[in-house]
């Protein structure tokens, strides 16, 4: 159930407790008996006569009744020990937190600082630090074992049945094995086709993997602005987003208290946290892009690396030479980071410092294993601008930068559009795979039409499902508030559920060997009128039950063999069940009266097959002519009867 923790003992208050009819379970992998990998088990009714269903779980300790949540203290940090055991790192006194890090806020406007402080770690020497470096050296890390276990969903015994059901999936070149092994994970990371975003300073993290040969992931954006929101609201939104299935969360804060907000989020986040560092750097120079400097930006990167941010969106592909390509666009440059860098380039008439200092950025991020999310600063902001030269020029540059980052030992994924009509989506996926060496693709939607403000979670969910099918590894959610305002708690939930649908639809279409198991479980519950199971197996049990209860609220209605859509007399599933029950109860004499002579005891398919054989013989007996005399046909029919 949903429990709002007491704000007197936990600040801020967050939602805890298990989802309806669910329990947290842990799997211990053979390769690392000391690991406990979380899954959510959906408990089915006794009437189901089938095992409970394990599903992927992003909720962290917030749904484990055995763990006491104290937001002030933050989550436990078991991953820190994994990092220390591997060696190659040092603990050091991090940079001093300065007033400018929080926008020089003071007095009543200053948010309370997070009390606990952990000295940061950084890599030293030539020893491998990043998951990419370990993978390239043939070393399987605990993070790799952990994500392999998560991806299998604890369903090894059921995979044979799932594979047979999904033999018709179209993977478009993805190669998803029946069972994910740690070695497969290592190989995918070594090839650059997958990443485990996991800063060595994010000890609270439960590792996850992003790549097209794994489950399609989703990201939820949160963050305050200069206009609205607070630390409390953003931490609550983070916990709320992962409750409904967000695999990663990006903190896109742009107002005051940016450092403090991020610290509260990270210390309570069991999932990877991403940021766009240029936003905070801009706040440090009073919001004027012209005043940005490489030194200021670098200091911001170090600040966020030490805090534990797992991936950075860096718009290093917005080059001076590409800006003029956006001049004839309907909506110009719509990316905040892209527009900031474009203005800086034009004001100084210089190449972007993100591009010219890219090698140095790689060296810095490698020390902390912060993954690149190479930003699409020139993405199309309208259907009219989709797939134009500006967009693809930047993508080609991102491909060049990807190879540099790999050479430096860094993990990389690529951000994509945006606003793209259905018929132009596949070329985006194909070009990204070609230009960027199959590095994971991470897209915002794309939105497939521009006519539905207030419903852009739907316009984008359509495109997200399609590009996920084509091979996109992670989908960034869009909420109903897109283009209209900062999303609130309910908008976050709607956005996450919409994108969980899109991601799951993608996995089904690709032929992921475990995807259909949940669909089949829902379908069986639906046909058997197990209403509670149907609710609980869904992505949003609360909403499903609430809709049902609007018209049939009584407990007795939860066992009724109909709903308010068709009523008891016109329910197709009940009629089908009645026909089956009737057929099963027939005696031999009754069956003989219903079946043609010689067919008693045969299945329906057998009767049909026998009848088809008779008609084939009849066609040959009558000379194999297409058009026959009617009287001859009547005579032949009388002979058969």
Swiss-Prot record:
It comes from the Bacteria. Binds 1 [4Fe-4S] cluster per subunit. The cluster is coordinated with 3 cysteines and an exchangeable S-adenosyl-L-methionine. Pathway: Cofactor biosynthesis; thiamine diphosphate biosynthesis. Homodimer. HAMAP family: ThiC. It comes from Rhodopseudomonas palustris (strain BisA53). Its cofactor is [4Fe-4S] cluster. Substrate binds at residues 221, 250, 279, 315, 335-337, 376-379, 415, 442. This is Phosphomethylpyrimidine synthase. GO terms for cellular component: cytosol. Catalyzes the synthesis of the hydroxymethylpyrimidine phosphate (HMP-P) moiety of thiamine from aminoimidazole ribotide (AIR) in a radical S-adenosyl-L-methionine (SAM)-dependent reaction. The lineage of its organism: Bacteria, Pseudomonadati, Pseudomonadota, Alphaproteobacteria, Hyphomicrobiales. One of its GO terms (molecular function) is carbon-carbon lyase activity. One of its GO terms (biological process) is thiamine diphosphate biosynthetic process. Its EC number is 4.1.99.17. InterPro entries: ThiC, ThiC-associated_dom, ThiC/Bza_core_dom, ThiC/BzaA/B. Belongs to the ThiC family.
């Amino acid at each position: 159930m949903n429990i709002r923790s007491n704000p007197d003992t936990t600040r801020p208050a967050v939602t805890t407790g298990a989802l309806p009819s669910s329990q947290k379970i842990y799997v211990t992998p053979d390769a690392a008996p000391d690991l406990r990998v979380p899954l959510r088990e959906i408990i089915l009714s006794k009437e189901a006569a089938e095992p409970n269903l394990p599903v992927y779980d992003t909720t962290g300790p917030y749904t484990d009744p055995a763990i006491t949540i104290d937001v002030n203290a933050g989550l436990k940090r078991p991953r820190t020990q994994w990092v220390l055991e591997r060696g190659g790192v040092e603990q050091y006194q991090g940079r001093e937190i300065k007033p400018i890090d929080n926008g020089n806020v003071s007095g009543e406007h200053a948010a309370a600082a997070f009390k606990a402080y952990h000295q940061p770690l950084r890599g030293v020497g030539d020893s491998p630090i990043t998951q990419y470096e370990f993978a390239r050296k043939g070393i399987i890390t605990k993070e790799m074992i952990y994500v392999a276990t998560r991806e299998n969903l604890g369903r090894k015994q059921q995979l044979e049945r799932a594979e047979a059901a999904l033999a018709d999936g179209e993977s478009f070149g993805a190669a998803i094995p029946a069972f994910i092994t740690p070695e497969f994970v290592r190989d995918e990371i070594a090839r650059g086709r997958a990443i485990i975003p996991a800063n060595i300073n994010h000890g609270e993290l439960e590792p996850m993997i992003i790549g097209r040969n794994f489950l399609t992931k989703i990201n939820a954006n949160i963050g305050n602005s200069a206009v609205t929101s607070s630390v409390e609201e953003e931490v609550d939104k983070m916990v709320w987003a992962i409750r409904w299935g967000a695999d990663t969360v990006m903190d896109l804060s742009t107002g005051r208290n940016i450092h403090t907000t991020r610290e509260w989020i990270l210390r309570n986040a069991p999932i990877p946290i991403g940021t766009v560092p240029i936003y905070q750097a801009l706040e440090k120079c009073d919001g004027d892009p012209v005043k940005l400097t490489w030194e200021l930006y670098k200091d911001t990167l170090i600040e966020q690396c030490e805090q534990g941010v797992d991936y950075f969106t860096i718009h290093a592909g917005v080059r001076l030479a590409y800006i003029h390509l956006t001049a004839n666009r309907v909506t110009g440059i719509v990316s905040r980071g892209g527009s900031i860098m474009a203005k800086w380039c034009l004001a100084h008439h210089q190449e972007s410092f993100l591009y010219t200092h890219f090698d140095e950025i790689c060296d810095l991020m490698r020390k902390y294993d912060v993954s690149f999310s190479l930003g699409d600063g020139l993405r199309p902001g309208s259907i009219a601008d989709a797939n134009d030269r500006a967009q693809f020029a930047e993508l080609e540059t991102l491909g060049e930068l990807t190879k540099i980052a790999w050479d430096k030992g860094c993990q990389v994924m690529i951000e994509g559009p945006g606003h793209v009509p259905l018929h132009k989506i596949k070329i985006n996926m194909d070009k990204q795979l070609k230009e960027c060496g199959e590095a994971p693709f991470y897209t915002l939607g794309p939105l497939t039409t521009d006519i539905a403000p207030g419903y852009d979670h739907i316009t984008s969910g359509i495109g997200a499902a399609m590009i996920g099918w084509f091979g996109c590894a992670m989908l960034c959610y869009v909420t109903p508030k897109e283009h209209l305002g900062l999303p609130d708690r309910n908008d976050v939930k709607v956005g996450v559920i919409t994108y969980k649908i899109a991601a799951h639809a993608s996995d089904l279409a690709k032929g992921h060997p475990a995807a259909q198991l949940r669909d089949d479980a829902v379908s069986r519950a639906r046909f058997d009128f197990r209403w509670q199971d149907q609710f609980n197996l869904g992505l949003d049990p609360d909403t499903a039950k609430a809709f049902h209860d609007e018209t049939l609220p009584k407990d007795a209605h939860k066992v009724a063999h109909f709903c308010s859509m068709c009523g008891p007399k016109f329910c197709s599933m009940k009629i089908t069940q009645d026909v089956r029950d009737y057929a099963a109860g027939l005696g031999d004499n009754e069956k003989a009266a219903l079946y043609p002579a010689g067919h008693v005891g045969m299945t329906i398919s057998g009767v049909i097959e026998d009848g088809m054989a008779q008609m084939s013989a009849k066609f040959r007996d009558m000379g194999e002519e297409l058009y026959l005399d009617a009287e001859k046909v009547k005579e032949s029919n009388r002979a058969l009867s």
